[in-house]
């Protein structure tokens, strides 16, 4: 994609190395082929970061906010990306990491993973995010003893981007917009934690807003 190509260029321009490996989170075959390539060409991952998002549900009109109006196929897509997809990525990547005895498996999540809430107009369909959090908890219990640091990272706010800056709230409350660099620092902090003091859930919230619970 254009975003991946731009990121690849930026990394290489700074003297780094990177590859773009596309996969479809709704396809087990696609995920397996992607990790087969990674393991064959680049070796066992040191870290796997799941950061897949989706827009499903944002265009539902205000008079159709109730669950009864939500198409089943919309729910299926959200479930694929938020729960089934991460499950398949874990299956494809963790066996080799377990045998290696080290690594981190970090999941980007949001506040909807903490408790069920009524969906507001313009929001994506976030019900399956609860299952993503549960997956992180299960993997923590199963793989910590094998040297794999699993963490669920709750990004509790709007991340700075051209699209986010165009929103009215960004003009009224710029202090509520989250820095991507600061979020990346938090992920790196998790990845480099000493194994005697692992954090398994981290919530990132702008100072000017109340944390979601």
Predicted segments, located by residue:
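The beta1-alpha1 cofactor-binding region of Rossmann-like NAD(H)/NADP(H)-dependent oxidoreductases
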Residues: 22-34
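Catalytic loop of short-chain dehydrogenase/reductase
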Residues: 54, 72-74, 78, 104-131, ...
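A short helix-coil junction within the Rossmann-fold of NAD(P)-dependent oxidoreductases
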Residues: 41-42, 55-59, 92-101
